[in-house]
């Protein structure tokens, strides 16, 4: 063991166990629902083991590992210093219930030089290990139940001479951040998993997607995630339209869509890819598809260059009339007349429709010479209708009342009736 490094067993004890060494002796097995990880480990019922980035370079006491971690089903040992396949063999042998193993970003020997036991793992994470195809093939041969393989942050050699399938059980492959520039490099990896269903190639500088013969040999491939790639042309999506088995597509955050609105992104992708059933995690209903296909036709009607799918959709829906654009945003100004017979006011002005009715009355105050507190306001519309403003309308903005050019405001001054105080009666005066 190198100076400064630790063993897996020692790290496990330090993180999950007390200092009492007797704790690893035989303990009566009981139910452990709700126990802390420390207690779970001490009672040999720990199921989740997280020892990533702890400078582990070897296993340590394998018997102790078997005792403490016999019920572990998920182990995260990523970002350590494990390099020997004998240590991987020890993990697989002594963790019989292991289902998920992360040994990513460990400096594993590129050649397997130790016999590995058959394991029941169903997910293996090998991110950043840079293992050649031959080594992957040998490793996965002892993992007959693996269905999910993580190989992100790896560099792959297009000239690798291993042409045989790496695994026939893997259904999901993660190839994120692998530096892929060409689609052929992606297919060079994916083709080695003939029963693959889902492929992730996120955050690669990939600029295009190209249909090729290898795709036809992958009949179960139905999910593709291209998030944060560098795809910048519709040609790639036209190529995807030829990959008819892919019905679930994720393409958020790609340059191609940057200049489009959310509505345009949705409709132009669905309209282009007739076989899609799910886009960016949302199911596509039959109503959504028809709406998108009609949008697609209208979008390209006036453009000289029309995509391949355009004719197919014209045959399906026919030539569509262009939709009339109706601006429903509120007007900001109107040209109106201000009328006040008492003050002989009759003038045409341009008013803002943003202020409230009360604020507008305050604006009219000096113009018509009627105090806003004594003002009665009417709206005379050009079509002959008349609206009067009550106190309940005072806090509403003017645009709420659909004021149009040519309408008039009539201002009247409220008549304030004052009552005179009755003079004191002579009787009351004399009695006092």
UniProtKB/Swiss-Prot annotation:
Annotated stretches, region: LRRCT: 254-295
Keywords: Cytoplasm, Cytoskeleton, Leucine-rich repeat, Repeat
Residues passing through the membrane, by range: none
Biological process per Gene Ontology, one example term: microtubule cytoskeleton organization
A cellular component term, taken from the record's GO annotations: cytoplasm
Region feature (Ubiquitin-like (UBL)): 324-415
GO molecular function: alpha-tubulin binding
LRR repeat residue intervals: 69-94, 95-117, 118-140, 143-167, 168-191, 193-217, 218-242
Localization per Swiss-Prot or TrEMBL: Cytoplasm, Cytoskeleton
Annotated InterPro entries: LRR_dom_sf, Ubiquitin-like_domsf
Main location: cytoplasm
Function: Acts as a regulator of tubulin stability. Involved in microtubule-dependent neuronal function. May be involved in tubulin acetylation/deacetylation pathway.
Protein name: Tubulin-specific chaperone cofactor E-like protein
Organism placement in taxonomy: Eukaryota, Metazoa, Ecdysozoa, Nematoda, Chromadorea
């Amino acid at each position: 063991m190198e100076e400064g490094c630790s063993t897996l067993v020692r790290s496990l004890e330090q993180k999950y166990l007390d200092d009492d060494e007797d704790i690893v002796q035989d303990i009566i097995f009981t139910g452990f629902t709700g126990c802390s990880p420390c207690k779970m480990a001490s009672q040999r019922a720990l199921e989740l083991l997280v020892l990533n980035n702890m400078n582990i370079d070897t296993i340590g006491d394998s018997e102790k590992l078997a005792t403490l971690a016999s019920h572990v089903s998920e182990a995260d040992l990523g970002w350590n210093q494990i390099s020997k396949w004998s240590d991987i063999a020890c993990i697989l042998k002594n963790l019989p219930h292991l289902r998920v193993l992360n040994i990513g970003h460990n400096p594993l020997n590129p050649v397997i030089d130790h016999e590995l036991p058959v394991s029941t793992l169903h997910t293996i994470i090998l991110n950043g290990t840079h293992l050649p195809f031959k080594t992957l093939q040998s490793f996965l041969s002892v993992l007959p139940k693996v269905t999910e393989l993580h190989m992100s942050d790896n560099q792959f050699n297009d000239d690798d001479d291993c042409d045989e399938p790496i695994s026939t059980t893997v259904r999901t492959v993660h190839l994120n951040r692998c530096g892929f520039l060409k689609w052929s490099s992606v297919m060079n990896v994916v083709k080695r998993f003939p029963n693959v269903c889902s492929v992730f190639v996120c955050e690669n500088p990939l600029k295009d997607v190209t249909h090729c013969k290898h795709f036809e040999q992958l009949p179960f491939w139905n999910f593709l995630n291209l998030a944060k790639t560098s795809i910048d042309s519709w040609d790639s999506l036209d190529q995807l339209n030829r990959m008819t088995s892919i019905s679930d597509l994720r393409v958020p955050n790609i340059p191609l869509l940057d200049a489009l609105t959310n509505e345009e992104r949705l409709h132009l992708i669905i309209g282009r890819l007739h076989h899609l059933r799910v886009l960016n995690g949302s199911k596509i209903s039959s109503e959504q598809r028809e709406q998108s296909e009609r949008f697609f036709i209208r979008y390209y009607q006036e453009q000289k260059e029309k995509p391949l799918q355009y004719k197919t959709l014209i045959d399906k829906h026919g030539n569509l009339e262009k939709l009339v654009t109706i601006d429903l945003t509120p007007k900001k100004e109107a040209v109106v007349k201000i009328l006040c017979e008492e003050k002989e006011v009759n003038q045409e002005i341009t008013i803002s429709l943003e202020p409230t009715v009360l604020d507008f009355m305050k604006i009219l105050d000096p113009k018509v010479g009627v105090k806003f507190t004594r003002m009665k306001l009417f709206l005379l519309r050009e079509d002959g209708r008349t609206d009067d403003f009550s106190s309940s309308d005072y806090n509403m903005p003017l645009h709420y009342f659909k004021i149009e050019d040519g309408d008039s405001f009539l201002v009247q001054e409220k008549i304030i009736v004052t009552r005179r105080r009755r003079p004191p009666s002579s009787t009351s005066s004399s009695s006092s």
